[in-house]
Amino acid sequence: MSPPLEPHDYIGLSAAAASPTPSSSSCSSSPNPGGEARGPRLTLRLGLPGSESPEREVVAAGLTLGPLPPTTTKAASKRAFPDSSPRHGASSGSVAAAAACQDKAAPAAAPPAAKAQVVGWPPVRNYRKNTLAASASKGKGEDKGTAEGGPLYVKVSMDGAPYLRKVDLKMYSSYEDLSMALEKMFSCFITGQSGLRKSSNRDRLTNGSKADALQDQEYVLTYEDKDADWMLVGDLPWDLFTTICRKLKIMRGSDAAGIAPRSIEQSGQSR
């Protein structure tokens, strides 16, 4: 008689059923105070699956939009640029040398000129200060030019003429040249009134050396000196006349009867 058939476990199902799994044992060995089993702890991370490494610290934090917490890995401690490189060292050395040269050249520069201080109340504005400084410098220049050789231009007026002219006495070398130039300037007024008396000695407008001859003259040339006195032209040397003359005026002979040349006045005072 053959022996009875016995079941054989060729796949190992009985052994797997007999030995409990570690997860089930851990779950059963750590019950909650309430007596319920607790599952494994799951955390939500941003990253690829399997990217977790044992060197990285696990930060128990929720998903936020703030800055990342500081890490201690080598990758985070690396710098984007090296501290020292040959090119960087050379450029820093050249910059330092240029700065040293500028520091040495700075004391050698001359300090700016001090501006004239304008004091007053209410406070004077900047454009007013500049205007006062410019006018002061201009006045000094005019005084210097007057002291050196008289004014540059002299005003010329004529009785009956509605306008004035200006002449530069330095452009003429004698009274005759000045007289001819003034005749050309006011020719329309002189020729319309019987013109000037032209003598043989070509004195033209300067023919007024004697007071009794002024009545015979249609026009005579007078000037104002630095003392604001009106005199007849032609009584002083030309060089001296150009330094003291301030204004010129072509007057009618009848109006200039009371004006005497400087030479006649000086002779009358000496008597």
UniProtKB/Swiss-Prot annotation:
* Pfam families, per database record: AUX_IAA
Gene designation per UniProt: IAA5
Q: Where in the cell is it found?
A: Nucleus
Q: What is its main location?
A: nucleus
Per the annotation, the residue ranges of the short sequence motif EAR-like (transcriptional repression) are 44-48
Q: What is the name attached to this protein's record?
A: Auxin-responsive protein IAA5
The uppermost taxa in this organism's lineage are: Eukaryota, Viridiplantae, Streptophyta, Embryophyta, Tracheophyta
Top-rank taxon, per record: Eukaryota
Organism, as annotated? Oryza sativa subsp. japonica
Task: Map out region (Disordered) in residue numbers.
Answer: 1-96
Function (record text):
Aux/IAA proteins are short-lived transcriptional factors that function as repressors of early auxin response genes at low auxin concentrations.
Stretches assigned to the PB1 domain? 151-255
